C-alpha cells in the first residue's frame, strides 16, 4: 500500500490530471529505483546505492486504485523504461490488461454474495423490488457497477464524501437507466442526476451543508420529525434506515460496535456520521468496498 498527496492542486480539472500524472511518474520511478531487479540471466540485482537489511525481494507490483485507476499504462511505461524485470506486467489493468471498472470484477463478485443472502431469505434481488441505500457514486467502479447489477432495485438514498442523494420513491426502471447514464459519463457526480427523474421530495445536497430543509417525503424516509438537518446528520439517518440492502461501494468505515470508540476505528473523516451496529436496520449488507464495518461490528451483526 502506498500513495502520494498533491499539494496546491490546480482548480482546473485538466491541469490537475496533468499534474497528478507527472507526479505519479516520479512516484513510480522512485519506488523502482530502490527495488531489487532481475537481470536477463535470472539473477537478482540490488540497487547499488541502497543499504538493505532484508533478503532480496524483486517482486513489486502496483494495482492502480481510486484516483490513479487510469494510470496503469503510465506505471508500465515507467517500468519498461527503467528496465524492471516485469516490464508491462508491472501494473494491473491498462490498455493491454483488463479494466476493473469496465469488467466490474469487484462489484459483480460482491453482488453474487448479495444474491445469495437474499435467496436464503426466499427472495430474488434480480426480480423482486428491493430497497437500497448506498455509499459511493455512479462514477466509481464498485458502487457504479454494483448499482447496475439489478434493474429492480430502488436506490432511495446514497452519499459519498461530497454529496447526498435522496430519492424517496424511485421508479426502478427509469432510475436504473439514469444510473447507467451517470456511470458512462466521464467524472460524473450526484449533481449530474436528472432532477426530473428524482421522486417527489427528493434531491441532491452537499454533505457539508449547514442546513437541509426536509420535505415530508424525506422526513418519512429518514424517520424524523425535524424540519431541517445538517448534511452530516442526514448521512447518519441514511445509515439508520430500515431497508433491504446497504451497498458499500465507497471509502470509509461507517458501522462500529457499541463497545468501540471513534478513536479505535481509525477513520476520522467519518466520525460524525458513523453509527453503531445496534442502530443498523438493513437486512443485507453488500460490501464491495473495504473496511466498511469494524471487525467487532461484523461479529455483532
Annotate each PLM feature:
Residues 8-57, 61, 67-301:
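Non-transmembrane, aqueous-exposed alpha-helical and coiled segments at domain scale
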